[in-house]
Amino acid sequence: GMENKGEITQLTSIAQPDISVITSIGSAHMENLGGKLQIAQAKCEILEGTKENGLFLYNCESKEIQEVLPTLDTENKKVVSFGQGGDVSITSDIEYDKEGIVFNCNILDTPVHLRAFGDFQAMNALPCIYIAKACHLKEESILNGLKNLEMTKMRTQLISVKNAYILDDTYKS
């Protein structure tokens, strides 16, 4: 993880990624960085550290990333957006059942069944889908991987108790 400005730069100088992703800009690092714009600037260090001709995916619904991105050198990198109106997007309502969520993605021909709960999990799956396709995985393999995903315990874990379900999302609470 990252807690301060410069940490990602240091890490990418040690191991330069071929592929990098920023899924969201939250408030987890506010005490060290000041605000969401500063968090986006620190997280975008990963783009600067990504190898030449590398792949960078970002959540186009983040106004902070949208603000920082034009200030960065993206030449010689493939930059792909995901989210509403992005290069990779959800093209249907997200449906829920006891197994998880189901949604359509604009770069797949078949609906995605994801063993996870929460609309944000569909959003998190989008860059994974794109990366898998970029690595030439077959659609069937991608869909099977998402359908058989095993989530960390206590992270949107559905527990059956008698005639009811409890959604346990208490990880690090």
Identify what each model region corresponds to.
Residues G1-E45, E52, N59, G118-A125, ...:
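ATP-dependent carboxylate-amine ligase catalytic core
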Residues Q10, L108-S173:
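Nucleotide phosphate-binding/pyrophosphate-handling subdomain across enzymes
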Residues I19, L55, A164-D168:
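Hydrophobic "anchor" residues on beta-strands that sit immediately upstream
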